[in-house]
Amino acid sequence: MTLSILVAHDLQRVIGFENQLPWHLPNDLKHVKKLSTGHTLVMGRKTFESIGKPLPNRRNVVLTSDTSFNVEGVDVIHSIEDIYQLPGHVFIFGGQTLFEEMIDKVDDMYITVIEGKFRGDTFFPPYTFEDWEVASSVEGKLDEKNTIPHTFLHLIRKK
């Protein structure tokens, strides 16, 4: 099993505001699709509700304490420990609480750094490059639909 974080955050580590992304960046959505298609996304219930439906062509797993939570096309787990039973490449997809629980346990992180400061009420936990090696850093292309500068980082935990 490979365990990764998949996240976009701004320069202040904002990841959301009122259960939505504070920015519109189609390049990041394509990046998520490219990385996670054919694999497993694990997210908290609020993150799932912000998306509104299972993402296609990948396994969608929702971690929730709500034992009555049931959505077609979604697998439900009720504890962090259940994540370790999932096969293949597993991406931790949010939100804040799940990231806080898992940042010290993942092998690597795929981070889209949004080069701006946005209003937010949910945040990605602090991390330092002392703990992570930059495997790749690619500037996102700007165009009429992608107007916010952004960088795609792949960080691997230092041994």
From Swiss-Prot:
InterPro entries: DHFR, DHFR-like_dom_sf, DHFR_CS, DHFR_dom. Its EC number is 1.5.1.3. It catalyses: (6S)-5,6,7,8-tetrahydrofolate + NADP(+) = 7,8-dihydrofolate + NADPH + H(+). One of its GO terms (molecular function) is NADP binding. NADP(+) binds at residues 7-8, 15-20, 44-47, 63-66, 93-98, 101, 122. GO terms for biological process: dihydrofolate metabolic process; folic acid metabolic process; one-carbon metabolic process; tetrahydrofolate biosynthetic process. Residues 2-157 form the DHFR domain. Pathway: Cofactor biosynthesis; tetrahydrofolate biosynthesis; 5,6,7,8-tetrahydrofolate from 7,8-dihydrofolate: step 1/1. It comes from the Bacteria. GO terms for cellular component: cytosol. Keywords: NADP, One-carbon metabolism, Oxidoreductase. The keyword NADP applies. Gene3D superfamilies: Dihydrofolate Reductase, subunit A. Substrate binds at residues 6-7, 28, 50, 58, 93. It is an enzyme of class 1 (oxidoreductase). There are two DhfR isozymes in S.aureus, this one is chromosomal and is sensitive to trimethoprim. Key enzyme in folate metabolism. Catalyzes an essential reaction for de novo glycine and purine synthesis, and for DNA precursor synthesis. Belongs to the dihydrofolate reductase family. This is Dihydrofolate reductase.
